[in-house]
Design a protein with these regions (language model features):
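A short beta-strand-loop structural module common to alpha/beta enzyme folds
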Residues: 2-11
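Residue-level detector of anion-binding/catalytic polar loops
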Residues: 2, 34, 150
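Short, flexible loop segments at the rims of nucleotide/cofactor-binding pockets, characterized by
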Residues: 11-16, 129-130
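Glycine-rich phosphate/diphosphate-binding loop of Rossmann-like nucleotide-binding domains
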Residues: 117-166
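Short, ordered loop/turn segments at secondary-structure junctions
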Residues: 8, 39, 75, 156-157
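Short, active-site-adjacent cap segments at secondary-structure transitions
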Residues: 11, 42-43, 159-161
Length: 166
């Protein structure tokens, strides 16, 4: 068992001037597993930054082909009273959220901020290919088959063309 450490995000920006060194990216790619911590913090949380800590995470996701975020929802009985929902609603919750990580708003161009006579303006572009949608849906379907057999796609198909593709 061998553990390697690499600087990513804000720490890497401070030390190396970039959120992710190619050597760290390559080390992650050749590893059997990657344990990843946070990339940023208040020090690097400035909207005007040209180099951002989270770019490390986006680069790693893309390079490693990590496209599915799988988040099970677990309700701990001793915390149920702390929820905004009634404990009776939380009983028996069996939910897993599957989120696509490498398409859409994170990667599509154009994106950016510009100053106009009326103030600042920002744009993010949402773009998905049919292959990206199919890939994440297959993850969701496989997961649903191994559980209760139910899958819900949460979108905004009444107004977003990208959602209609789903």
């Amino acid at each position: 068992f061998r553990v390697e450490h690499g600087d990513v995000g804000g720490v890497s920006i401070d030390k190396h001037g970039t959120p992710l060194l190619p050597s760290v990216r390559d080390s992650a790619a050749s590893a059997d597993a990657v344990l990843f911590g946070g990339v940023g913090g208040p020090k690097w949380d400035t909207p005007d930054a040209s180099v951002r800590p989270e770019d490390a995470l986006l680069q790693l996701r893309s390079h490693l082909g990590v496209f599915a975020n799988i988040r099970p929802v677990k309700v701990y009985p001793w915390l149920a009273d702390s929820s905004a929902l009634k404990p009776s609603v939380l009983e028996g919750v069996d939910l897993v959220v599957v989120r696509e990580l490498t398409g859409g708003l994170y990667y599509a161009q154009p994106k950016g901020r510009t100053e106009t006579p009326q103030g600042w303006s920002a744009v993010d572009t949402m773009r998905y290919s049919e292959a990206e949608v199919e890939r994440i849906l297959r993850v969701g379907f496989r997961l649903a088959q191994s559980r209760q057999g139910k899958l819900a796609s949460v979108d905004k198909a009444n107004v977003l063309e990208c959602s209609r593709l789903w």
